[in-house]
């Protein structure tokens, strides 16, 4: 049975949302360019794929952007496809 996604942590100094699952670090990285979060990379170990971990990381990043009034540049292909699957997030796109 898939493990529940642990709490997502935001490390502002690293420009990263992350969690650890089964001892493996899972991340959603970004850069700031003014008030735009450039979402550059989402990484989940192949053994953990299909559990909703990447989606949880991206959802946390987009919630942070919305709360702080940032726009999002989805440079990562996973973030782009997530936003397309969740049209309520498209208003964040820069």
Q: Where are the regions that the model predicts?
A:
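N-terminal first-folded block
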Residues: 1-42
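Hydrophobic/basic alpha-helical segments enriched in Actinobacteria
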Residues: 16-20, 25-26, 35, 48, ...
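A short, internal acetyl-CoA/4′-phosphopantetheine-binding micro-motif in the GNAT/acyltransferase core
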Residues: 43-49
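Conserved acetyl-CoA-binding loop-helix of GNAT-fold acetyltransferases
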Residues: 50-61
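C-terminal structural segments of small proteins and small subunits
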Residues: 60-94
